[in-house]
């Protein structure tokens, strides 16, 4: 009988923010299960290795929690050349239309996974919403004519009737996501597929692509929970993979995750926030005991974001340019555009989140440890530290998931 050694995904790694090695281990396990080989986990023969590549924490038992529903979404699908470069978008935003309405209604900033892990490509998108008719869309002259010329020929032969018949609209405009985001000043985004599990803020005017998962919350506490080691481990084990990169999906990673009591998506479904003196945002109307934990998480998360932003866009190398003011408006609805100062273009181009997490400087690790400690405190865990085994964290989270799943039956 042959043996195959498999790296235990529950063992702490030198770089816990990367999961590439674990994906390779999973493939080794699959090959072993398809043969007569006996599997050794970290050098020891084990009776059972679960589908999530652990010997004693069976996360395949984790259930979707109703308290998490309706908050995280895979974003829009284009199915056509709806995207345009920033220079063209800004020109269109200054153009009049025969019905007197602004192109800002249908020309929006756009972001995909690359814009998150690298730098924003200054791509915009034409978006005629979820139910705008062809007759209603056509007076937005330049955007409509672009779509008619570049999208309609491709869509006319599409086998799916909704794509073919509604060629001027995005193939999957995700109305539930739009409804959940309505009225928020910002939202949380993470790449579907990435080397590192990163969460960032995106301005409300940005339309996200399907290579991003969007969470409809504007408070720093929720971002901190999602960016904690606890959620990262959970999402790595319960997510899938694309080649050597972990994939994040709302159904497996988000909807199963047992948020701290009082800070679940159901608890914060009202989406209202309260600003702390330092500018951090927490969910409004929290009970005192929960509020203390929310404040700690929010402050730690805001500190991380502030440090990252300063590294990505150092003021010595970059400058903020006022964004375009669309025709008919008195001020720009968009945040200032960050560009490199003359002579620093190459240096700024290297300042990406992927490069930052590859470097993982001490200040970044410390900022994440502060988030982890604050989130663990919200669970009542006083022993959380970088030395706490991954398997122990997952065991506790699974127990909480199963407890809540049983209560919702």
Model-predicted regions and their roles:
Residues 1, 19, 23-44, 51-409:
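S-adenosyl-L-methionine
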Residues 1-12:
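Conserved beta strand-loop-helix elements of the APE1-like EEP
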Residues 14-17:
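Leucine-rich repeat
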């Amino acid at each position: 009988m042959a043996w195959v050694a498999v790296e235990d995904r529950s063992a702490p790694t030198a770089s816990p923010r990367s999961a590439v090695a674990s994906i390779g281990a999973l493939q080794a396990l699959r090959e072993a299960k398809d043969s007569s080989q006996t599997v050794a986990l970290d050098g020891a023969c084990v009776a059972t290795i679960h589908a999530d590549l652990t010997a004693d924490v069976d996360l395949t038992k984790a259930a979707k929690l109703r308290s998490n529903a309706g908050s995280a979404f895979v974003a829009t699908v284009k199915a056509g050349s709806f995207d345009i470069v920033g220079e063209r978008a800004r020109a269109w935003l200054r153009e009049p239309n025969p019905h007197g309405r602004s192109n800002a209604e249908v020309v929006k900033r756009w972001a995909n996974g690359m814009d998150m892990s690298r730098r924003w490509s200054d791509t915009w998108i034409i978006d005629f919403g979820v139910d705008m008719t062809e007759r209603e869309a056509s007076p937005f002259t330049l955007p409509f004519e672009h779509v008619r010329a570049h999208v309609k020929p491709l869509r006319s032969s599409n086998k799916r009737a909704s794509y073919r018949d509604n060629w001027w609209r995005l193939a999957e405009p995700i109305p539930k996501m739009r409804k959940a985001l309505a009225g928020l000043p910002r939202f949380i985004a993470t790449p579907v597929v990435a080397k590192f599990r990163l969460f960032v803020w995106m301005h409300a005017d940005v339309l996200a692509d399907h290579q991003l998962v969007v969470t409809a919350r504007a408070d720093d506490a929720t971002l901190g929970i999602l960016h904690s080691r606890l959620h990262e481990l959970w999402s790595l084990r319960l997510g899938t993979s694309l080649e050597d990169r972990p994939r994040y999906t709302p159904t497996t990673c988000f909807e199963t995750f047992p948020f701290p009591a009082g800070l679940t998506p159901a608890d914060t479904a009202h989406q209202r926030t309260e600003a702390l003196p330092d500018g951090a945002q927490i969910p409004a109307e929290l009970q005192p005991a929960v509020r203390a934990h929310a404040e700690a998480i929010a402050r730690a998360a805001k500190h991380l974001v502030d440090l990252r932003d300063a590294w990505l866009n150092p003021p010595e190398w970059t400058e903020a340019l006022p964004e375009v003011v669309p025709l008919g408006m008195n001020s720009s609805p968009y945040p200032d555009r960050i560009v490199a100062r003359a002579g620093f273009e190459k240096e700024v181009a290297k300042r990406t989140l992927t490069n930052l997490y590859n470097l993982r400087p001490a200040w970044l690790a410390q900022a994440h440890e502060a988030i982890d400690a604050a989130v663990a405190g919200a669970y009542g865990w006083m022993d959380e530290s970088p030395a706490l085994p991954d398997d122990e964290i997952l065991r506790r989270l699974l127990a909480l998931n199963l407890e809540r799943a049983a209560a919702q039956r």
